[in-house]
A protein has these predicted regions:
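Alpha-helical scaffolds flanking conserved acidic
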Residues: 155-158, 181-187
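Hydrophobic (often cysteine-bearing) scaffold residues that line and stabilize catalytic clefts
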Residues: 74, 78, 154, 158, ...
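Metalloprotease/metallohydrolase-associated module, dominated by Zn2+-dependent proteases
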Residues: 5-14, 20-68, 84, 130-143, ...
């Protein structure tokens, strides 16, 4: 499908700009169409190079290493799948160049995959809009090893991204809104010490998991994680229903 067809069919363009003029919109391929990730998304604004998904990527693994080319491709493919859901739900997406603490993705390595780096251990997580993912999560071997070590039967790149973006949207939708009291009624008080909560969760003395109260065992560790796990599963359900509908 070429840009003229997109315009003729009246498809909605997802641009990082808040508004798009009423005149004819000319699409062009994302600049990463010609990179190793082969991004197939289009861009509506002629002044922008990258699609709304690629524009949120801040750091990628060193592409001089052949393994990292596939890692980056798989990470971005999962991120585009995430963004389709976010866009369909009309959730706000502003990247790190558009506002302070805007959405940014850092796909990082550590010494386990690149001995020349100073970072010994990269943990997947979120902080003030920045979502960090260990690039090795794109490796099947590493993924299965972590499944065994962490006791996680369901562990995917997309699952990580759904979970971490839940923390990001908590900051936007809940933290400074009238919804905070309702959040605490349902999930608990997020002001309890996060470090101590996780230390207790990973200790031998953690309480027995109660499946009638939490959607996953990790959700029981802290209200923030309860929210993020619930959010991730909601996005998973939405995607599953869309798949079912597509099959009629």
């Amino acid at each position: 499908m070429w840009s003229g067809e997109l315009t003729a069919r009246g498809l909605e363009a997802h641009s990082s700009q808040k508004t798009i003029p009423d005149e004819t919109i000319y699409f062009h391929p994302c600049a990463n169409r010609y990179s190793d990730i082969l991004c197939n998304w289009a861009v509506a604004n002629q002044e922008e190079q990258f699609c709304i998904s690629c524009a949120c990527t801040r750091t990628i693994p060193d592409q001089h290493f052949e393994k990292n080319q596939k890692r980056w491709r798989d990470l971005e493919m999962a991120k585009r799948r995430l963004f389709i859901t976010l866009l369909n739900l009309n959730l706000p997406i502003e990247n790190f160049t558009q506002k302070e603490h805007g959405l940014a993705f850092d796909f990082l390595e550590d010494q386990r995959s690149n001995p020349y780096l100073e970072l010994e251990h990269v943990l997947t997580g979120h902080s003030q809009g920045i979502i960090t993912v260990n690039a090795m999560e794109a490796d099947e071997g590493f993924l299965h090893t972590m499944k065994e070590e962490m006791g996680e039967s369901y562990r995917t790149i997309l699952g990580h991204l759904r979970h971490e973006v839940g923390h990001y949207y908590w900051d936007i939708l809940i933290h400074t809104s009238a919804q905070l009291d309702k959040f605490r009624e349902l999930f608990g008080d997020e002001r309890q010490d996060y470090g101590q909560a996780l230390e207790k969760y990973y200790s031998k003395d953690r309480p027995k998991f109660r499946s009638n109260l939490y959607i996953t065992q990790y959700a029981s560790s802290h209200p923030h994680e309860d929210w993020a796990e619930t959010w991730a599963h909601y996005l998973h359900i939405v995607d599953t229903l869309e798949t079912a509908v597509s099959y009629g």
